[in-house]
Amino acid sequence: MSATLSIQTDLVYATTPAGELRGDLYRPAGDGRFPLLIAVPGGAWRVCNRAKWRDWGEYLAGRGYALFAIDYRTATPQRTAFPEAPCDLLAAIRHARGNASTLSVDPDRIGLFGASAGAHLAALAALAPEHRAFEASKSLNGFGSIAAHVKVLVGAYGIYDLFRHWQDDLALNPPPDGNVVRNLLGCDPFDNQQRYVDASPLRQISYAANKVSALIAWGGDDEFVNPAQSEIFVRALQQARFNVRTHKAVGASHFWVNHALSDPLGHSARFAPVLAEFLDSFL
């Protein structure tokens, strides 16, 4: 471990009926009040690997930021993950704010950084932390009375309109293969339209939430998540008078955020200074 880097692994941030949830904290070494990004892994809401965020943790710590990469509850054939997954993320925000002194983070400078399904969850938490569907998040740790708002949202190739992604995934994976949105929500949109509305960040955009600054990134050649998901989301944020920055990774497909930052020609490395400038300005 670098003398300038502190890494704490397997920190428990919530206890759920399915077990404990943990995260890994990367931050500059020594005492301080470092601005914090909570990293939300992707994985089609089926898998969640926080270890993939180590590169970003080390990079951001080198720039004076902390990063808390978390696990959350995922969907299985026997269990949906909505509203559980966004509840877990909100619990992580409350945990970080409630333990700010112990973790050496600034409770007033917390943001979210998600990729793919993680960007979906991050957007939901940033836009609608007090949504009635997420009330259970307050009982997952001892910080239920603490606010779960954030200052910034960073979303990479996210899913923001679940009805549209349900349609796109149906075309890519026709029956009998499982539809990832159906696995998440436990229903089709024609079974329960309101559930799709509640779970879609696009439908949670409001003037009341526009104090959150957003950086939305996507790959121009993404074969798993339609780039229109990000483009339409950005347009709606702008219409609601959010402060929005964008980054289109020309020629990139999916997964590029978790490619090695050591490759100077990689899309992840090219995104790094864009992210750093955004955080320096708004977090």
What are these regions (language model features)?
Residues 33-43:
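Short beta-strand element of the alpha/beta-hydrolase
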Residues 1-32:
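N-terminal cap/lid segment of alpha/beta-hydrolase-fold proteins
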Residues 16, 127, 135, 139, ...:
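Mobile cap/lid helix-loop segments that gate and shape the active-site cleft of serine hydrolases
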Residues 216-218, 222:
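Short beta-strand/loop motif that positions the catalytic acidic residue
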Residues 49-56, 68-107, 263-268:
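Catalytic nucleophile-loop/oxyanion-hole region of alpha/beta-hydrolase
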Residues 94-169:
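Primarily recognizes the serine-hydrolase "nucleophile elbow" in alpha/beta-hydrolase
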Residues 262-283:
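Catalytic active-site module of serine/aspartate enzymes centered on a nucleophile-bearing elbow/loop
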Residues 223-232:
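Conserved alpha/beta-hydrolase "acid-adjacent" motif
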